[in-house]
Amino acid sequence: MAAQAAPAEELSKLSVDETKPAPAAANGNDSDAESGDEEAEEGAAAPAAGAAKKKKKRKPKKKKKAPTSQSEPPRVLVSQLFPNNQYPKGEEVEYVNDNLNRVTNEEKRHLDNLNQEFLTDYRHAAEVHRQVRQWAQKSIKPGQTLTEIAENIEDSVRALTGHSGLEEGDALIAGMGFPTGLSINHCAAHYTPNAGNKMVLQEDDVMKVDFGVHVNGRIVDSAFTVAFNPRYDPLLEAVKAATNAGIKEAGIDVRVGDIGAAIQEVMESYEVEINGQMLPVKSIRNLNGHTINHYSIHGTKSVPIVKSNDQTKMEEGDVFAIETFGSTGNGYVHEEGEVSHYAKRGDAAKVDLRLSSAKSLLNVITKNFGTLPFCRRYIDRLGQDKYLLGLNNLVSQGIVEAYPPLVDKKGSYTAQYEHTILLRPTVKEVISRGDDF
């Protein structure tokens, strides 16, 4: 930016008086008296010049421009990239059967407009998820520890929402809606490293990356799978296609059992060749999609990923996580391994806790996570230690739910893809949809 011109009044004070006659000279030389006068004038002019220098205006500092793109790793607040809370919409998909009625119905459109705060929070959370996961897909490489990968994702989510979660109650405003699951190979879900975990991602691993982002309790739950060996591509393609089939089938008044049938048909049309053997891709029949409630990752409705007689209907206003899991193994998972995922139950009965460590930890959980899922690393970063006995007591009392890792048979490979959808009055919005999947 160019320096601004000084005001005319300032310049008039500092300029030499051009109307005053110059002193006479004799034979080209000044007289002694004239010389003395000149010296006096020069002496007077010197401070004036100094004053001019002092009064010279400094160049105004250039204003920092607001960022227009995301950094790598992601650290720019998403709210700065989208002024006035104008976050991108998800993919809007028309309802198949009664779409015309819903789009043209004035009452339905009015209901849609009433949900602006709800939609703004969801779209904000979805944009954070998109930006973080798109960076994660580029940055995750063999040789990284799972702890490094998880913390990179979580630090990015906290930076983009503007809530570090270190002050009491801060994580309840915005941040992680579900701990970063990094489930490898035959482990399908609910694995994240606890403190001290040294596990390293290998070239031949198939890793599910499942994490949630929330803004004001509106949780966006979405997952993808990372594999570096192209032989696993058909497995990933099967699960991605099955998830999209479930999303396509979903809608108001649709029975969840019918969605499961559509998912299974697509999923099990794929095969994958591993070590010269053709293996069918199977839907993991005891894993489901689910509704998402305010500050609660699991609602009361489930969406099977196999054909089912479940007659439960999706309803207007529901928020669903449509997630599918495919496996080269049995297509059935069981609990195995050290627990890392937990959540305080919203329906827990009031219990008189006798263990002081359990009472203290419950207070920490309530004030920092509420009913949002958390993992042990989140408790560690709050400065808590020696809490495991108290945590196990809260689980045994039914106050906190533990979510152990879910595994198929050893030697098998599993994949997962997941999106969050909103069943709005006029349209189905795949809120977490991105250019990546």
UniProtKB/Swiss-Prot annotation:
Name the SUPFAM superfamilies for this protein: Creatinase/aminopeptidase, Winged helix' DNA-binding domain
Which amino acid positions bind substrate, per UniProt?
Answer: 190, 298
The UniProt annotation puts the region (Disordered) at: 1-90
Disulfide bonding pattern of the chain: none
| InterPro entries for this protein | Creatinase/aminopeptidase-like (IPR036005), Met_Aminopeptidase_Type2 (IPR050247), Pept_M24 (IPR000994), Pept_M24_MAP (IPR001714), Pept_M24A_MAP2 (IPR002468), Pept_M24A_MAP2_BS (IPR018349), WH-like_DNA-bd_sf (IPR036388), WH_DNA-bd_sf (IPR036390)
Q: Where is the composition biased (Acidic residues)?
A: 31-42
Location in or out of the cell: Cytoplasm
Task: Indicate, by first and last residue, each region the UniProt record lists as having compositional bias (Basic and acidic residues).
Answer: 10-20
Query: Catalysed reaction(s)?
Result: Release of N-terminal amino acids, preferentially methionine, from peptides and arylamides
> Which domain of life does the protein's organism represent?
Eukaryota
**Matches recorded under CDD domains:** MetAP2
Q: Which cofactor does it need?
A: Co(2+); Zn(2+); Mn(2+); Fe(2+)
* The record's free-text note on cofactor binding: Binds 2 divalent metal cations per subunit. Has a high-affinity and a low affinity metal-binding site. The true nature of the physiological cofactor is under debate. The enzyme is active with cobalt, zinc, manganese or divalent iron ions. Most likely, methionine aminopeptidases function as mononuclear Fe(2+)-metalloproteases under physiological conditions, and the catalytically relevant metal-binding site has been assigned to the histidine-containing high-affinity site.
Grouped into one coarse class, the protein's main location is cytoplasm
| Cleavable signal peptide | none
What's the stated role of this polypeptide? Answer: Cotranslationally removes the N-terminal methionine from nascent proteins. The N-terminal methionine is often cleaved when the second residue in the primary sequence is small and uncharged (Met-Ala-, Cys, Gly, Pro, Ser, Thr, or Val).
The UniProt family comment states: Belongs to the peptidase M24A family. Methionine aminopeptidase eukaryotic type 2 subfamily.
Tell me the protein's name. Methionine aminopeptidase 2
